[in-house]
Amino acid sequence: MNTERRIVLGADHAGVNLKEKLCAHLKELGFEVINVGTFSTDSCDYPVYAKKVCNTLQTGEADLGILVCGTGVGMSMAANKYKGIRAACCSDTFSARLTRIHNNANVICIGERVLGEGLAFDIIDAFVSAEFEGGKHQRRISMFENGVEE
């Protein structure tokens, strides 16, 4: 069972409704939830909220992050610009679980316009319950973090 119990969530205007539901769901599961916004459906810039989530992880205030926008793609692109962040855009439970087990992802990005609420909850549950295996997977992560030597 995963012991990482502090989760930071952020969203833009296209993901705010699902983010709020995920916050409540994760609290019910016993997680400490940090909600960095947005709190409105007024148009806003998703990189602002990706930065807030990534900075919260970088300072050690949270163990895992969740970003929600329309598709999850823009958030994942923005989040992966930050040192130490391994963000994956997932639309199914298998990918969400394996990105933790094999890629040691610390941020999952999902799309409110892509997923229904039930599937979104299942994806997040798969992500937060999985743990990194290490071993050969750590070697591969080191390769993309430090560059590949041929």
What are the functions of these language-model segments?
Residues 2-10, 14-15, 93-150:
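C-terminal binding/interaction regions
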Residues 6-7, 61-65, 84-86:
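Short active-site oxyanion
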Residues 17-28:
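Short, solvent-exposed amphipathic alpha-helices that sit
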Residues 32-43:
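A short beta-strand-loop structural module common to alpha/beta enzyme folds
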Residues 48-51, 90-92:
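Charged helix-capping and loop-helix junction motifs
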Residues 67-113:
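Mid-chain, well-packed structural core segment of small domains
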